[in-house]
Amino acid sequence: MSNKVHLGHTARKRFGQNFLTDENVINRIVGAISPDNEHVMVEIGPGLAALTEPVASGIDKLTVVELDKDLVERLKTHPTLKDKLEIHQGDALNFDFKQLVREDMQMKVFGNLPYNISTPLMFHLFEFAQYIENMHFMLQKEVVLRLSASPGTKAYGRLTVMAQYHCQVMPVLEVPPGCFTPPPKVDSAVVRLVPYKTKPFPCKDVEVLRHLTTTAFNMRRKTLRNNLKHMLSDDEFAQLEIDSTLRPEQISVQQYVAMANLFIDKQTKS
């Protein structure tokens, strides 16, 4: 049998499907998720239910978002899950997660995410951070390193800044390729993201922060002065006590927020 087939389902490359099969890893992830009935439990990409089954076993209801129609049909007829699941068939990248929030109940979101959509999905989920208690995701190890990176490192970038603006980021465990069917070509890791109830460095307009960080990191080898010359002047960098000759990966989240807020203030006055 092909190593792309697991439980009778052939992994689809276009959906980035790699199914988690290692029981020890599954148990550790479920322990980190800590399922309960006090939150709206949401799984993205349940696949063949490796996490779905143990999470659902201890709670009354689990909401899942799955793109693959064949997998949705399997879940609808699953002997132990079908009565516990609220199934949404569709693309998580376009899904309105706010609709899942119930009165006085925030979401706990988790999943073994398709690696080909993990970065855009992170940005999409950050839009709903105020409704989320925490998130646990299996990702490429490289993406987890980017999420948790410090300024001055190669992994530090736009994703780092936006993730750490919205959330505390904590790597949980590393997972080798042999824990999956089919084995991915890269190492994986689980990360815990806890959205801030109160932002340590509040930005007046998050869209401006996103635009500024995207602009800054578009050319990593260039200086801030070069990359942000259409947004901030040398005098404004001096006002913020930021060295404009530094490269974008040398600037902290707090400094990016300060630059965005100054730019917003300038636009408001003009």
UniProtKB/Swiss-Prot annotation:
PROSITE patterns: RRNA_A_DIMETH, SAM_RNA_A_N6_MT. The keyword Magnesium does not apply. Keywords: Cytoplasm, Methyltransferase, RNA-binding, rRNA processing, S-adenosyl-L-methionine, Transferase. It comes from the Bacteria. It is found in: Cytoplasm. It catalyses: adenosine(1518)/adenosine(1519) in 16S rRNA + 4 S-adenosyl-L-methionine = N(6)-dimethyladenosine(1518)/N(6)-dimethyladenosine(1519) in 16S rRNA + 4 S-adenosyl-L-homocysteine + 4 H(+). Its main location: cytoplasm. S-adenosyl-L-methionine binds at N18, L20, G45, E66, D91, N112. GO terms for cellular component: cytosol. It holds the Pfam family RrnaAD. Its EC number is 2.1.1.182. InterPro entries: KsgA/Erm, rRNA_Ade_diMease-like_C, rRNA_Ade_Mease_Trfase_CS, rRNA_Ade_methylase_Trfase_N, rRNA_adenine_dimethylase, SAM-dependent_MTases_sf. GO terms for molecular function: 16S rRNA (adenine(1518)-N(6)/adenine(1519)-N(6))-dimethyltransferase activity; RNA binding. Signal peptide: none annotated. Belongs to the class I-like SAM-binding methyltransferase superfamily. rRNA adenine N(6)-methyltransferase family. RsmA subfamily. NCBIfam families: ksgA. Specifically dimethylates two adjacent adenosines (A1518 and A1519) in the loop of a conserved hairpin near the 3'-end of 16S rRNA in the 30S particle. May play a critical role in biogenesis of 30S subunits. This is Ribosomal RNA small subunit methyltransferase A. The lineage of its organism: Bacteria, Pseudomonadati, Pseudomonadota, Gammaproteobacteria, Alteromonadales.
